[in-house]
Amino acid sequence: MGAYRADDDYDYLFKLVLIGDSGVGKSNLLSRFTRNEFSIESKSTIGVEFATRSVHVDEKIIKAQLWDTAGQERYRAITSAYYRGAVGALLVYDITRHITFENVERWLKELRDHTDANVVIMLVGNKADLRHLRAVPTEEARSFSERENMFFMETSALDATNVEQAFTHVLTQIYRVMSRKALDGTGDPMSLPKGQTIDIGNKDDVTAVKSSGCCSG
């Protein structure tokens, strides 16, 4: 195992938000990715929690600042601050509860109302280990994600299936959009100080990256 770099030693800082109904497993996805932990007794998040983890992309260190909030309506007052500066999002539903998938459309609208048009979004069908209880067909979710220009994966925070891949794919896509902008001369991400909000460009930038294809459960 290589030596750890200092926590503040990174090339880019990206803010990602986790959104979706209460009980879909957002907090466990966060803890699985950042600490490799899963809690059966996981309780609803009160207010906002955030954690960080750094990953390597093309020999750069990307530090992800991951924000998680409760899905219950009574916490909606934090909306604006929660979304501010986000360049990526995991929109999570529970494959065993169709209502959580139906509500994805509302969460997506809220996300797009409060973020830049180019935010990189991964639709995540969590609890994929509970195949015998599936209520949301994979194809239904995949079709929706394609219509809405999102990436898509099914995950299990319990057994860690696709958790790493979902987060790192979003981070990689954000980085590639930025890198293309720098090469095109339309932006210079290298000049951004650490922690500054990153503008990932116009809609075409993200669409071009997404057209290369992605993921499935």
Curated annotation (Swiss-Prot):
Lipid modification (S-geranylgeranyl cysteine) maps to 214-215
Q: Which GO terms describe its molecular function?
A: GTP binding; GTPase activity
Q: Name the major location.
A: membrane
Give GO cellular component annotations, separated by semicolons: cytosol; plasma membrane
Q: Which domain of life is it from?
A: Eukaryota
The keyword Ubl conjugation belongs to this UniProt entry's keyword annotation: no
| Subcellular locations according to the entry | Cell membrane
The record places the motif (Effector region) at 42-50
**Residues annotated to bind GTP:** 20-27, 68-72, 126-129, 156-157
Q: Which UniProt keywords apply?
A: Cell membrane, GTP-binding, Lipoprotein, Membrane, Nucleotide-binding, Prenylation, Protein transport, Transport
Transmembrane region(s): none
Q: How does it sit in the membrane?
A: Lipid-anchor
What's an example Gene Ontology biological process for this entry?
protein transport
Query: From which residue to which does the signal peptide run?
Result: none
Q: Among its keywords, does the record have Transcription?
A: no
UniProt xrefs under InterPro entries: P-loop_NTPase, Rab_GTPases_membrane_traffic, Small_GTP-bd, Small_GTPase
User: What family name appears in the similarity comment?
Assistant: Belongs to the small GTPase superfamily. Rab family.
* Biological role stated in the UniProt entry: Intracellular vesicle trafficking and protein transport.
Q: State the NCBIfam families in the record.
A: small_GTP
Name of this chain's protein: Ras-related protein RABA1e
